[in-house]
Each structure stands twice: as C-alpha cells, then as structure tokens.
Swiss-Prot record:
Belongs to the ViaA family. It comes from Salmonella typhi. Homodimer. Interacts with RavA. Keywords: Chaperone, Cytoplasm. This is Regulatory protein ViaA. It is found in: Cytoplasm. Gene3D superfamilies: von Willebrand factor, type A domain. GO terms for cellular component: cytosol.
Length: 483
C-alpha cells in the first residue's frame, strides 16, 4: 500500500510547512500560554522538546498509509501520464468510470471537461491531467492536515498531563533551569494524580522544615576542592613569619644554645679559663652550641623554606553522585521517617539542579535500592516515599552495600550519606578498615545525618562530617520558636 511520504514525494507536497504551522498553533494555545506565565522555568524545557515533537510528527506522516481509494486513483493517474493523446482517448471511458466508482472529488469536473468539448485535443489532454494532479494535491494536503490535527490533539493532551505533573512538582524539585529541564523529561511517564501527590505532600512537609532543607543544601554542596600531588613536583619557595625572642634584654625567659658571648652562662665562661677545655669552648662557639640566656620579646622575622608543589592538579568542586542509605528500623518511624524521606527529597532536588545522580538504599534486615535521577525517577521516588520504616537495624550491611557500589567506575567520586539515629551495633573491623581506605586513597566522603542526640560515638567516628538534626520534642519546639 502507498505511504503518505511516497505520495507527498510524487506530488511534490511539502509537509514541513504544515508541521511548523501546527507546532506554532500548539505553542499559541491558551493552555500553554497560561502555563508558561505561571512556571517560566519550564518554558525553556518545553521549548527544548520542540525538535523531538517535529521528528515525531515527521515520522507519523512518513509511516501513515494512504487510503485504498486514493492509492488506486494515484496509480491510474501515473499510468495516464504515460499515454499519448490517442491512447488516452481510448482509455478515457474507463478512467471516468474509475473516478466515479472511487467517488473522487475530480470525477464531476472530469466528466464536465469531456462533455463540454466534442473534440479531445492534445491541449485538452494536458489540461485534464493538470487539473487531475491539482485535485490529487488537494486530497494529499487534506490527508496530511487531518493526520496532523489528530497528532496535535494527542500531543496537546500529553503536554497538558505533563504540564500538570511538572507544575505540581516544580516548587519541590526544580531549583534552577537545569532541574526544570530534567523534571520535564521525567514527567513523560504514565502517572496518575494520586501517585505524585505523595511527592507534593512531602514537599509541603519539607517547606515547613526549612532547617532540614538548609541542611540538605549544605551537605550537597559541602565538598571542597582537593589537591592532587604530582610525581617529581618542582620545589617552591614558602615564606612564613615566625616569632622568636627579641635581642633587647627585656626579661630572661630560659636558656638556649647559641654563640652570643654577652649572654653566656657562668659555667660556659669557666671552661674558657681551663687550658684543657679551651679548644672545646671554641668548637662549641663555632657550632653555636654554647648555653646562653634566652631573652623574652615579641620580635618577628620572615622564615624562607622550600617544599614540593602539591597544588598543580586541582579538582575544583567535584560534583559526584549521592549514595544515600536510609535506616528503616522501627526507631526511625513516625516523625523521624517523615524527616528522612523529606531529606532524601531535598537531596534529589540538589542532584537535579547540579546534574548529579542520586541513589537511595534502604537498610534494615535487607537492602532495597532506588534510582532518583534516571528517566523513571518520579516513579522510583513515589515507591520510596511509600515505604514504611518497621524493620531492624543492620548498619554493617549498609556500609558493605556502599563499598560495593563505590567499586564501579561511574561511582568513583560518589559521596555517601547515611541517615539514621545510629542506635545500632558496632561496625566490624573489616568494614571500618575498608571505609578508611576509600576515604584515604580515593577521597570518598562519608556523611552522617544524625536524627538523634543518642547515637553511638563508636559508629559515628567513621564519618568525615556529622550533620545533626535532632528530632526530639525539645529540639522541635526550639526550632519552631526560633522561626
């Protein structure tokens, strides 16, 4: 069967203009205009999606099939072009019958041309074919427009659903234009209103806990630039100011070794008067090893030393992925659970803004994993927020899962974040040793977000940074009072 793309090529019908006209009509629709005014950050994200829309429309037109009636008429037209005028006159009754049978828009006009001219001349033959071709072009254009109109309605429906989803989640997850673009891409999934309302709910909870949001932003952007030493690094001059006793005799502050004759201790002067020790005295004088009085003062001088250059290869503000481990034990239920989930949502916001990955692992007696920065991030976030914290505490398995994840090439610069009350058993020595190796050799950072003031110091000693957010009633009341 004839495709619409082939028909457009045969009749020299350009679909590009129709596609562009449809895109402009879609962008000018009242729904999109109001949406862009309300969420200006998402306007760039939608605009960036236009090439994909154009490609989808072209693909739809290219793959569309021409109706059988129009296909038969086009084939008849092509065959008629090859006939001479005498041959065409012989075939004319069959052509008119075919047009009538196919209910062609050109059938009535073709019959009128034939009946109004008693002699069928070559000029009339050319005019017949030209008008027939014009009728086919009109039919092809109409077919293109019908398909584009169907696609426009479908595209507008999809865009409205994505706009509703993105508009609801934009205050929670979109910090900048980059985050808005990624949020728009993630909104392409099939989600119902009741699903993403869970994210909106925790977003409202996060807005009511500004200290929690501030803590997430500080943690997410806390990593400093690191210096990477080079082999055979050149030496550089290093100047420092050092304080040493002044030469002005203000106050005796002790004794020291030196060659100041005026400050010599009496026993040292006594050796000068002994013949056997005279050469020993001069030797110690030359080597500045004579005991002298040390005078107290506030004199400063510049000390010049040399050291290897260690700041040549600087990795400025590395933006690695997050590996977040959340304690789902029973002690983390209630308000702790709400804070932990909201904190992960805040880290997801930071990851979207900085174009980083955010990987969540829930640990109790087992480890459950969620990817919050991939194409299905919204679905994954909803599943994570739907979890209930009712398990036990196995923090060792959490660290082993982190260590295993950091062995991969794509996680070589990851930051680990452990959210817990840290009321658990001590860590095995092999885990502590492996974490220390990752910190020392690969510059991995391990952050602790402590939800309790009663965490075990033996466990928390392993972390580079400890961020405290006490969820006790007293701390909650103090935070509310400070606001």
């Amino acid at each position: 069967m004839l495709t619409l793309d082939t028909l457009n090529t045969m009749l020299a019908v350009s679909e590009e203009g129709m596609v562009e006209e449809m895109i402009l009509a879609l962008l000018a629709s009242p729904q999109l205009v109001i949406f862009f005014e309300k969420f200006p950050r998402l306007k760039n994200a939608v605009t960036a999606d236009l090439p994909r829309w154009r490609e989808a429309l072209r693909s739809r037109l290219k793959d569309a099939r021409v109706p059988p009636e129009l296909t038969e008429e086009v084939m008849c037209y092509q065959q008629s072009q090859l006939l001479s005028t005498p041959q065409f006159i012989v075939q004319l009754p069959q052509i008119l019958a075919l047009l009538h049978r196919l209910h062609s828009p050109y059938a009535a006009q073709a019959k009128q041309l034939t009946e109004s001219n008693s002699t069928f001349t070559p000029a009339l033959h050319t005019l017949f074919l030209q008008r027939w071709r014009l009728s086919l072009v009109v039919q092809a254009t109409t077919l293109n427009q019908q398909l584009l109109e169907e696609e426009r309605e479908q595209l507008l429906s999809d865009v409205q659903e994505r706009m509703t989803l993105s508009g609801q989640l934009e205050p929670t997850l979109a910090e900048n234009d980059n985050a808005a673009g990624r949020l728009w891409d993630m909104s392409a999934g099939q989600l119902k209103r009741g699903d993403y309302q869970l994210i909106v709910k925790y977003g409202e909870f996060l807005a009511a806990q500004p200290e929690l949001m501030q803590l997430a932003e500080q943690l997410g952007r806390s990593r400093e630039a690191k210096s990477v030493p080079k082999k055979d690094a050149p030496m550089e001059t290093f100047r420092t100011l050092v304080r040493e006793p002044a030469t002005v005799p203000e106050q005796v502050d002790g004794i020291q070794q030196g060659d100041d004759i005026l400050r010599l201790l009496p026993p040292e002067l006594a050796t000068l008067g002994i013949t056997e020790l005279e050469y020993e005295f001069y030797r110690r004088l030359v080597e500045k090893q004579l005991l002298t009085y040390r005078l107290h003062g506030e004199a400063w001088r510049e000390k010049v030393t040399e050291r290897p250059v260690v700041h040549q290869d600087v990795d400025e503000q590395p933006r690695g992925p997050f590996i977040v481990c959340v304690d789902t034990s029973g002690s983390m239920g209630g308000f702790n659970e709400q804070c932990a989930k909201a904190f992960c949502l805040a880290l997801m916001r930071v990851a979207l803004a900085d174009n980083r990955r955010c990987f969540i692992m829930l640990f109790s007696t087992d480890v459950v994993r969620y990817e919050l920065s991939g194409p299905e991030s919204i679905e994954q976030a909803i599943r994570f927020l739907s979890q209930r914290f009712r398990g036990g505490t196995d923090i060792a398995s959490c660290f082993r899962a982190i260590i295993e994840r950091m062995q991969g090439r794509e996680w070589f610069d990851a930051d680990a974040v452990v959210i817990s009350d840290f009321i658990a058993q001590r860590l095995p020595d092999d885990v502590v040793s492996k974490v220390g190796e990752l910190q020392r050799l690969h510059q991995h950072r391990f952050h602790a977000v402590a939800m309790s003031a009663h965490g075990k110091p033996g466990i928390m000693r392993i972390f580079d940074h400890i961020w405290r957010f006490d969820t006790g009633m007293r701390s909650r009341l103090l935070r509310r009072w400070r606001r």
